[in-house]
Design a protein with these regions (language model features):
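Class I SAM-dependent methyltransferase "Motif I" SAM/SAH-binding loop
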Residues: 56-60
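Conserved beta-strand signature within the Rossmann-like core of class I S-adenosyl-L-methionine
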Residues: 321-322, 357-364
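Core SAM-dependent methyltransferase catalytic element
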Residues: 354-358, 377, 381, 403-423, ...
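A short acidic, leucine-rich amphipathic alpha-helix
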Residues: 439, 453-462
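Nucleic-acid modification enzymes, centered on SAM-dependent nucleic-acid methyltransferases
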Residues: 2-53, 67-286, 300-331, 345, ...
Length: 515
């Protein structure tokens, strides 16, 4: 493959979020890129045997898809919880899931009757159980939490039931089997705690933790106690489905001699827990063939704070927490801290790439100064922006998005850069910076009058303004953009979540009068 001749992807690839059992349903996580989109990008920009890196690895979608495509995957994340999920799902060492099912039956023999007894127990009986099981220390939680201490996240019944299952898992002698059983247990924890918000009008079990929707430890006003063993059994079934899928792909590749070659996680997957801005010491300059990454979006999610629920009980210690690239959180990181971490991480990505290789960064935020950090960091290292695609996240929207539909960005921008053999000079238009109105007048005619999403316009404006050195003129809030669109005769369709051109004569006259 001649990397210089690769035509960049210039179209949005629709998400197929539920097609892969290895990612969908096996374990919740804060953000997760659609695996079919990631897979398409990895396949397009790299070859079998290439080194593919994700410096902000999360739940491992990039690394797992790269490994299954025969690449050598490097997954990096400061969060041990993220690395645990990735390692467990990706592991190809089992011959089949027969041993795993047998291990699950052994867990049932050790604790099933005790767990069922807990579900019927009185308060006095529950106290007796809690005094005789191994529990983690009752540590203090982040200030933003509704609960002050760790145990406050659970009802006594949930705490006792989860402890009984984990104690039974901990005596499993096989490390690989124990890790997969803990993955199912860990996924159960997400449902068996007081942050679980049951979906109204649906079965009690249909819902999710506020940790993954509101992004804080918000306790439910109506506590739901789901059946403990059945919840664990259901999560285990999802782990079995994920592992069967991984092993089928492995066996097909290894038996048929598919282009990606033999798949072996021990040879093809490396898990790191480093500061993304300091990977050079671990990997070396010009050592990577492709990078696909999704850095944190400012202060949206305090990943390490919100992972205490799992890291603490699983016994994982968090190193380098002061290197987390976020705004706020328990350590109250400043915006300057975030921008510095983002800038250094992106610059490091370009340095890690071999010449004539590609980098894709997924990002979205109303604060265009964050985009400027990314775009400038790549340009300063000699990289060239080749594609900027808006990915429409066609998923169930958060409550915040539903209530503020026209002001919240629901999609993301996929920025793809190329690192030439010779360092590129920063070449951008030096003409007079364009105002917001000038940018709107230039880019609106190119959008369909039948409708477009806010993020589609915003992303076009962002790239256009950066190329004209005018990003500072986009430092406006969402309301101002909405007002400018209405002045030009556009209306927001709250049902379809798109802007439509109002072609009525009265609306056109009103729009002209407002201007």
């Amino acid at each position: 493959m001649n990397r210089a001749e690769i035509e960049p992807i210039q179209r949005d690839i629709p998400a197929a979020r539920q097609e892969a059992a290895r990612h969908y349903g096996v374990h919740p996580y804060f953000t997760r890129r659609p695996s079919n989109v990631v897979r398409a990008y990895v396949k397009h920009y790299s070859c079998a045997g290439d080194v593919v890196l994700d410096p902000f690895g999360g739940s491992g979608v990039t690394a797992i898809e790269a490994m299954l495509l025969g690449r050598r995957a490097i997954h990096n994340d400061l969060n041990p919880f993220a690395n645990f999920i990735t390692t467990a799902i990706a592991d190809t060492s089992l011959e089949s899931t027969v041993q795993l099912r047998e291990a699950f039956r052994a867990i049932g023999e050790r604790c099933y009757s005790k767990v069922k007894a807990v579900e019927r127990a009185t308060d006095t009986e529950l106290n007796g159980v809690l005094n005789n099981v191994s529990l983690p220390e009752n540590i203090r939680l982040p200030r933003s939490s509704d609960a002050e201490f760790f145990y406050d996240l659970f009802t006594p019944r949930q705490l006792a039931g989860l402890a009984l299952i984990k104690n039974a898992i901990d005596v499993e002698p096989s490390h690989n089997l124990r890790r997969l059983l803990l993955l199912a247990w860990s996924a159960s924890v997400a449902k068996l705690n007081k942050t679980f918000l049951s979906a109204k009008g649906r079965a009690e079990s249909r819902g999710g933790s506020s940790i993954f929707s509101i992004y804080r430890y918000k306790l439910a006003s109506d506590i739901v106690e789901l059946p403990i063993w059945e919840t664990f059994e259901g999560r285990f079934a999802n782990v079995i489905a994920a592992k069967n899928e991984i092993l089928r792909i492995r066996d097909y590749s290894n038996v048929t001699g598919a282009p990606q070659g033999h798949i072996n996680s021990h040879r093809q997957l490396t898990i790191l827990s480093q500061d993304a801005a300091d990977l050079m010491n671990e990997l070396g300059q010009a050592s990577v063939d492709y990078i696909f990454t999704d850095p944190p979006y400012g202060g949206h999610i305090a990943y390490l704070d919100l992972s205490i629920l799992w890291n603490h009980w699983l016994g994982f210690s968090v190193k380098n927490s002061d290197a987390e690239a976020i705004v706020g959180g328990e350590l109250r990181f400043s915006e300057d801290h975030y921008k510095a971490k983002l800038r250094d991480s992106i610059r490091q990505c370009v340095e890690l790439l071999r010449p004539e290789r590609w980098l894709t960064v997924v990002f979205q935020h109303w604060d265009v100064s964050y985009f400027q950090v990314i775009l400038d960091a790549v340009a300063e290292e000699g990289g060239v922006l080749k594609a900027a695609i808006t990915h429409d996240k066609d998923v169930i929207w958060s409550m915040h998005k539903k209530k503020n539909a026209e002001n919240v960005l629901g999609g993301e921008m996929l920025l793809t850069f190329y690192k030439p053999k010779e360092r590129a000079r920063v070449m951008r238009e030096s003409k007079k910076p364009s105002s917001l109105d000038e940018l709107l007048d230039e880019y609106l005619p190119g959008l369909p009058t039948t409708g477009f999403r806010t993020e589609s316009l915003f992303n076009k404006l962002t790239i256009g303004a950066w190329e004209r050195q005018s990003l500072q003129n986009l430092a406006v809030d969402a309301q101002r953009v909405a007002q400018a669109l209405r002045r030009r005769g556009w209306e927001y369709d709250i049902e379809q979540h798109i802007w439509r051109k109002n072609t009525s004569e009265s609306a056109s006259e009103l729009a002209l009068a407002d201007r």
